From Swiss-Prot:
Source organism per UniProt: Paracoccus denitrificans (strain Pd 1222)
Known function: ATP-dependent specificity component of the Clp protease. It directs the protease to specific substrates. Can perform chaperone functions in the absence of ClpP.
Binding site for Zn(2+): 15, 18, 37, 40
Tagged with keyword Cell division: no
Keyword Kinase: no
Protein name: ATP-dependent Clp protease ATP-binding subunit ClpX
Family (UniProt): Belongs to the ClpX chaperone family.
Amino acid sequence: MANPTGGDSKNTLYCSFCGKSQHEVRKLIAGPTVFICDECVELCMDIIREETKSSALKSGDGVPTPREICNVLDDYVIGQEHAKRVLSVAVHNHYKRLNHSSKTDIELAKSNILLIGPTGCGKTLLAQTLARILDVPFTMADATTLTEAGYVGEDVENIILKLLQASEYNVERAQRGIVYIDEVDKITRKSDNPSITRDVSGEGVQQALLKIMEGTVASVPPQGGRKHPQQEFLQVDTTNILFICGGAFAGLDRIIAQRNKGTAMGFGAAVKEDDDKGVGELFKQLEPEDLLKFGLIPEFVGRLPVIATLGDLDEQALITILTQPKNALVKQYQRLFDLESVKLTFTEDALTAIAKRAIKRKTGARGLRSIMEDILLDTMFDLPGMDSVEEVVVNEEAVDNPTAKPLLIHTDSKKETASAG
């Protein structure tokens, strides 16, 4: 399509890939009998960059080094440097162990991972990114839906079934996959006395997870066991499946603070020495005994030898999340306003105020969208019916003052007005 018919084709040059003329693009690069425009070059660069990220540079034995894994995590996850390092080393060692398992008579044990951190701090995103880097089957399970076998709810074998589905029923690939079990703090023991009643969704689930996490040959029904009892079972060895468990563990910080205090304390009593410490700081002092007090059984804690704690995202990290990633929230809303032919601008003070509100709400990065919707709701309601609006400016007052609205800049007068309430 370097020279389409029609128009002034003799004098006009066209991109051989997208067909745009030299007048529609900024640059047109010429080669022997072909041309490529700057937009196609940028597209090619994006494709190459994505390919490079998804198949991170390999070390000599085909396993990405911890630094390479950490560098790719940096592209997707903001902050949480300590957790990234812990995860990078654990995952590198796990897949190195698989590649060298038959080369020596020393058997290397598997190191499953426990991620502990407040809501919205990036636990799930870290696990998803790891699977993308390593190009292995990945599945995510919700621990709150699991029950012991024989009770209403999902069996733990359903987790392995989801992993099989992610690997298109390739058993060999599934046996090298990653399973992320979310909300694992919700399956804690419901009572200190386990004999009072049957705990089918708490301690019972922990007991059921023990064998598949440690390594066993699980019989997995390909169509789900309860609806098709007559089907053939697939045998899946879970020995080399990496299990990552994550949870917010609300209240665990108080257990750690009480242990640090070193004395018995009444219910709800404040720990003055730890008042200025954030949740993330207290999580760094975590000991296995704290998890036992929280309600995890000793056998379950023992099968999660690698513990990575994540802290609350600070103000600067939240501002970065708002503006930097490819699909950052600010860019998403700017695109929405672009569809109305209106420019959307956030002042630096406004971004700082949004981050401060998210910190107060204690919802982490997840709370940012809710705050943005709150600020822009009335403007997005009125804007489609308004003429001559060229730009919407969100300043600090529009964020902090519930009655204040973003400023509207009109084309004709260039006069700033408050958005109609």
